[in-house]
């Protein structure tokens, strides 16, 4: 018969006041007095009211004895006690016993003990040290006496076996173990199990300090598990050591016949096969809070009370007092959005506890609640993030604010979807902007230029912020004018252009222009002009002239004044044509257009 999770309550928790001037049965008065004492003992147990209400009379007595034994053990370690197990040497103790009269009496169990000076290090401010240490342990702690009775089990045993701590304390461990593995546990509880066979049992001292390694134990067994739907058992690896249990006389151990001090096994129990992340009974990290219209906290889940280290007497409390100072602006924007539109997008920020100043990474959303068609309160749905997810999303918060424009529960349920911003859907505003920014494909003389509007300007700015590559800006190209085209081709007339012009406006290599002689050749006929080839050009397409090295003629001689050439200086400068799009051009043509632009600009 294996253990099962069954607890029944068979006595009343609240006593009715005795009736006056009525005759009662003495046995009934005795039962009422006994029930009253049991209720008082039950309220002293370190459990919440919901757990205590499910305990029966025998469970209350069993748990009271178990916690008294644990307290007696640690009090015997911290203070001089007549129950100190002097029958075993110090090698079987968890730490060296040294009485400390100056230390005031404390009923706190030491979490860390300094072996150098033998002093317990208690930190009253570290209220959640036990919870943190159990999470980092990767298993639960189990203490067994030499008769196989569970002396102590940590609170997180429920996360691995499904049994509450109150179900297993002061119960035989064999009810939790498979019948084929019970003999292995009995052998491990025997202090002479690991004695070398070559040594005589009467000459070998297993409790000597040099033989302390023979007190170490390591065994695996199949434990009854209520969380396993396949076979109902979970293989657990038990690794620990035999130690003396102080403050526990031999007569207190159930079924014990041998006299003398009690020796027990203290071990750490971890799953033999580490469970996958999906199999772990993860804590529900979805939390909810209720706020006034100004953001003040009015109610919240019990987990939020523990996180923020506040109680109901502190309410109402301004929410901005709990938000990290660097995230107050983000919270204010979400608050304003909820007031205006009834809901806000997802926001990532940090909450800071009031006492220990611990930081929590939170992903939340706001919604407005109405009563009689009027705003009544604001509800926030929170999801706790780990430090890696929170730091990553905080770095991308500027990008997320531009994309998460509407509330979506799917992102709240799966915050890992937000780690890749490329997977987020684009809002409809950006899609409309992309449609209006498509390059024109009409065969006009010059490409159409869309008029920049505030919408397109914002879209371009968002596109630049979200882009991961730096796109080089192509310099603006001036529009060729009537005079400029006559310089390239004297036969060009206004309104008449080659047939291929609409298809490629700036592809000048197809029409090699005829450059006039520079004015410098008129004043200096003896100067030898050498053709120069520019890199990236075809030598047969365009030739530019360059003066010899070291020849610097006078500017007036280089350009002599002529009355017929006055229109050169009076001709207006070509206007710059700003295009919002970068048209793909070939590499060779790009250098050519740049040189032509410089020539026309001068």
From Swiss-Prot:
BP terms from Gene Ontology: intracellular receptor signaling pathway; negative regulation of locomotion; nervous system development; positive regulation of transcription by RNA polymerase II; regulation of transcription by RNA polymerase II; response to xenobiotic stimulus; xenobiotic metabolic process
All residue ranges annotated as the bHLH domain in the record: 18-71
Disruption phenotype: Defects in neuronal differentiation, axon branching, aberrant cell migration and abnormal aggregation behavior on lawns of bacterial food.
InterPro entries: AHR/AHRR, bHLH_dom, HLH_DNA-bd_sf, PAS, PAS-like_dom_sf, PAS_fold, PAS_fold_3
Residue ranges of the motif Nuclear localization signal 2: 28-33
UniProt function note: Probable ligand-activated transcriptional activator. Acts as a transcriptional regulator in GABAergic motor neuron cell fate specification and development. Promotes cell-type-specific expression of guanylate cyclase genes that have key roles in aggregation behavior and hyperoxia avoidance. Has no role in carbon dioxide avoidance.
Protein name, entry field: Aryl hydrocarbon receptor protein 1
Gene this protein is translated from: ahr-1
């Amino acid at each position: 018969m294996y253990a099962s999770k069954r607890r029944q309550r068979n006595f009343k928790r609240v006593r009715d006041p005795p009736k006056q001037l009525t005759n009662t049965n003495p046995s009934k008065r005795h039962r009422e007095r006994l029930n009253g004492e049991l209720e008082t003992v039950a309220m002293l147990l370190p459990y919440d009211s919901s757990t205590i209400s499910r305990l029966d009379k025998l469970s209350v007595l069993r748990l009271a004895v178990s916690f008294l034994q644990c307290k007696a053990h640690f009090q015997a370690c911290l203070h001089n006690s007549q129950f100190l197990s002097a029958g075993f040497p110090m090698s079987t103790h968890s730490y060296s016993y040294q009485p400390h009269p100056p230390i005031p009496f404390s009923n706190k169990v030491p979490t860390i003990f300094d072996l150098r000076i033998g002093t317990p290090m208690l930190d009253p401010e570290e209220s959640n040290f036990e919870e943190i240490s159990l999470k980092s342990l990767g298993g639960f702690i189990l203490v067994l006496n030499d008769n196989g009775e569970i002396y102590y089990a940590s609170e997180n045993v429920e996360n691995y076996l499904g049994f509450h701590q109150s179900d297993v304390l002061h119960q035989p461990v064999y009810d939790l173990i498979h019948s084929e593995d019970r003999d292995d546990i009995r052998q491990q509880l025997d202090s002479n199990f690991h004695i070398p066979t070559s040594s005589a049992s009467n000459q070998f001292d297993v409790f000597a300090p040099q033989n302390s390694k023979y007190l170490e134990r390591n065994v695996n067994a199949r434990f009854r598990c209520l969380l396993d739907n396949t076979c109902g058992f979970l293989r657990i690896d038990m690794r620990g050591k035999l130690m003396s249990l102080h403050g526990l006389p031999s007569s207190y151990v159930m079924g014990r016949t041998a006299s003398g001090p009690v020796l027990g096994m203290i071990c750490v129990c971890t799953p033999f096969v580490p469970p996958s992340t999906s199999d772990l009974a993860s804590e529900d990290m979805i939390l909810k809070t209720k706020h006034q219209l100004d953001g003040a906290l009015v109610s919240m889940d019990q987990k939020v009370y523990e996180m923020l280290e506040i109680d109901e007497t502190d309410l109402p409390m301004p929410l901005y007092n709990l938000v990290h100072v660097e995230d107050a602006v983000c919270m204010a924007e979400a608050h304003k959005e909820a007031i205006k539109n009834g809901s806000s997008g997802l926001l990532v920020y940090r909450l800071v506890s009031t006492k220990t100043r611990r930081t929590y990474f939170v992903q939340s959303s706001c919604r407005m609640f109405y009563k009689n068609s009027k705003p009544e309160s604001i509800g926030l749905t929170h999801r706790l993030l780990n430090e890696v997810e929170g730091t990553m999303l905080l770095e991308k918060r500027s990008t997320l604010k531009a994309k998460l424009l509407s509330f979506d529960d799917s992102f709240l349920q799966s915050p890992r979807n937000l780690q890749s911003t490329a997977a987020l859907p684009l809002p409809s505003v950006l899609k409309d902007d992309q449609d209006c920014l498509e390059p024109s494909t009409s065969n006009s003389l010059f490409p159409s230029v869309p008029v920049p509007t505030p919408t397109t300007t914002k879209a371009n700015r968002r596109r630049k912020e979200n882009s991961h590559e730096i796109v080089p800006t192509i310099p603006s190209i001036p529009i060729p004018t009537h005079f400029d085209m006559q310089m390239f081709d004297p036969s060009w007339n206004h309104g008449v252009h080659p047939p291929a012009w609409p298809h490629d406006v700036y592809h000048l290599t197809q029409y090699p222009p005829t450059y006039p002689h520079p004015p410098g050749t008129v004043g200096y006929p003896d100067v030898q002009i050498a053709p120069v080839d520019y890199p990236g050009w075809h030598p047969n397409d365009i030739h530019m002239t360059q003066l010899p090295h070291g020849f610097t003629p006078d500017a007036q001689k280089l350009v002599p004044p002529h009355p017929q050439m006055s229109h050169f200086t009076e001709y207006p400068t070509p206007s710059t044509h700003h295009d919002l799009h970068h048209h793909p051009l070939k590499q060779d043509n790009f250098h050519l257009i740049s040189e032509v632009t410089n020539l026309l600009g001068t």
